[in-house]
Regions:
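Helical scaffold of the NTase/Pol beta-like nucleotidyltransferase catalytic core
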Residues: 1-28, 59
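Generic detection of long, well-ordered alpha-helical segments
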Residues: 2, 6, 57-60, 153, ...
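Short secondary-structure capping/turn segments at boundaries of alpha-helices and beta-strands
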Residues: 14-16, 33-37, 48, 67-70
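A generic short-segment signal for beta-strand/edge and adjacent turn/coil regions
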Residues: 14-19, 48-53, 98-104, 161
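Short helix-loop boundary/capping segments at the starts of domains
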Residues: 18, 53-56, 69-73
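Short helix-terminating capping/connector loops at secondary-structure junctions
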Residues: 21-23, 41, 74-77
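Catalytic metal-binding acidic patch
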Residues: 31, 36-62, 78-85
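Conserved NTP/Mg2+-binding pocket subregion across the NTase superfamily
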Residues: 65-174
Length: 174
């Protein structure tokens, strides 16, 4: 199983390097994989891609297409990815702007109209405050410099609000 996870991570890294080239700042693993409690049957693979500049629509589409291929090698819960700009990692803003999300929850929309979905898939996300905090403390740099060189401090109030928001949504989603 560890070999399978390593293959998935290598594919993610190769895909991002190919698509974003010099625009890619880093790829950071968080969640159960970073905490060392990953369970193939119950966990997803959580990661954040950081770029210097906003990706083009074509880059977003290519990323989603490649992640859908990689997802076939993944656990049932799949991949959960957010693409964010470097400026918001370093100079934190809450709720945090994002360029693209990918997860099982979005798959159907990707298949319905990939271009339209990628064109409109951006906004802000309160969950990123918690993700950034975890990445800075326990995250794994799959590619790029260490997390503490990319991610600034998240104010405690934003971190706690992010967790509160996640708990409130968990009740609805369960």
């Amino acid at each position: 199983m560890e070999l399978q996870i390593q293959k998935v991570l290598e594919q993610i890294k190769a895909t991002c390097m190919d698509i974003f080239s010099t625009n890619l700042v880093g790829i950071y693993i968080h969640g159960s994989l970073a905490f060392g409690c990953f369970n193939w049957d119950k966990s997803d693979i959580d990661f954040i891609i950081v770029t210097r500049l906003s990706p083009t629509l074509q880059e977003k589409e290519k990323l989603v297409e490649d992640l859908l291929k990689i997802d076939k090698m993944c656990p049932r819960k799949g991949l959960e990815m957010s693409l964010v700009l470097e400026e918001y990692c370093h100079d934190f803003l809450y709720p945090t702007p994002f360029e693209l999300h990918f997860s099982n929850a979005h798959k159907q929309k990707f298949f319905e109209n990939l271009s339209e979905y990628c064109a409109h898939m951006n906004g802000t996300d309160k969950d990123l405050a918690a993700h950034f905090t975890i990445i800075k403390q326990s995250g794994i740099a799959l590619y790029g410099e260490k997390a503490d060189g990319v991610f600034g401090d998240v104010p405690k109030a934003n971190y706690l609000d992010s967790i509160k928001h996640d708990i409130e949504n968990a009740v609805v989603e369960i």
